[in-house]
Amino acid sequence: KSKENEDRILFEVSYNILEFAFEKATKIQEVEERFTEYLSVIQSILGEDDHELQGKGIHPFWDKNDNNPVQSPRYEMLMQYLSMSKTLKLKDLHSYPEYGAFICGNQIQLDVSKENFISVINVFNQIEAAKAYLFANSEFPDSSWNTKIARDIFWEQSMHGILQENAGVN
């Protein structure tokens, strides 16, 4: 947690993925400034050992990393749930239940007034497809999936996707 504000940098699901959670801001540029500053410090530290953060939807070294969850009941439960796909033998599920530890995405939470709620929702709905393609997807070289949106396949053809309300744009 930052000493100057409520920003937090934490591990998301596994120790391979960092989450940046920012305090409320009046302008998105304020968040961008803080993100740029944090990223610069982190990249400098990681660079000392020839590592770096990359903005990819799938960790490029997913098959070499320790994909165990962060020791937290929430993440341990998530990974156990995803692993149920091995025993349920449901049709059309992929064989990578550990994917929760090496894929990442983006989330945006905005505070909006009642007056502009509908227009804000409409704008975000219009950019959702582009946002998903640009920020949350990647190729997955270990599979026969000939796509640049492998993150969607991980999600939709897993235990997450067996519930229709968890997959696609609803």
Question: Where are the language model's segments positioned?
Answer:
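Phosphate/nucleotide-binding catalytic core
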Residues: 1-170
